Amino acid sequence: MLPSHRTISRSVLWVCACLILEGLLHPCQSSAQNSLQQQVSLTISAAADLSLAFQELGTLFEKETGTKVIFNFGSTGQLAQQIEQGAPVDLFAAASIDFVDGLERQGLILPDTKALYARGRITLWTRADSPLRIERIEDLSRPEVKRIAIANPDHAPYGIAAREALQSVSVWEAIQSKLVLGENIRQTLLYAETGNVDVAIVALSLSRQGEGRWVLVPQELHKPIDQALAVIKGTRHEQETRRFAAFINGPEGRPIMRKYGFVLPGEESVK
């Protein structure tokens, strides 16, 4: 006997209901999975001398872990001030350990995460087409050198090192009228790249990747530029932030940092 019209209708309705229910359930399940797997993003406040190295590190870290890294590059002193004012930051990578120590005294970092990750060097940088031949820092007092850029020593560790080096060779006072101050070391280099100054005293990490000419400033002319990092207290992603901090000082990060001219913990600096 053939099934009745009513039986067929009920069967069709039952199948349709199952299909509708299946369609409703799967998006919910997918949405839940997406929510659970939502990508974590870390906000890293880092000194401007790290811009090239850390962008490469961040790309590799995201590829290996799936954690996105967003960088805020700037002057170490200004970044520290932002953190003091409550900026939502997960990790602070400073160009001087002094600023990390300052945040620690205020209870703003996780003390066990404070670590040195590099020692910086400064260089004398000129454009490749510059007629000037700058071989040593004393050359900056020559009359043909009209404008010199350094990072602002009021809040930039590389600017402090530049000032110390200039004072060590007794030309600091003589070049005051030539000085142009950059807000951070990246802006300082930009002044020279664009021809707004003749010479810039900038981080080796930036000089090595540029197209200009540069010479190292002897490290004995200034205090060591010991760079440190720390996880910020109150981070919402402590586990991932700790992992990125370890990544910088680990076997994945050290070769990248070394490539950009940083002296790493446990290694000796080039004279």
Put a short name on every predicted segment.
Residues 2-15:
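Bacterial N-terminal signal peptides that target proteins for export
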Residues 5-7, 23-27, 31:
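Compositionally biased, low-complexity segments
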Residues 6, 19, 64-66:
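Intrinsically disordered/low-complexity terminal segments and short unstructured peptides
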Residues 14-26:
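Bacterial N-terminal signal peptides
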Residues 28-66, 70-73, 77-87, 94-97, ...:
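Exported/periplasmic ABC-transporter solute-binding proteins
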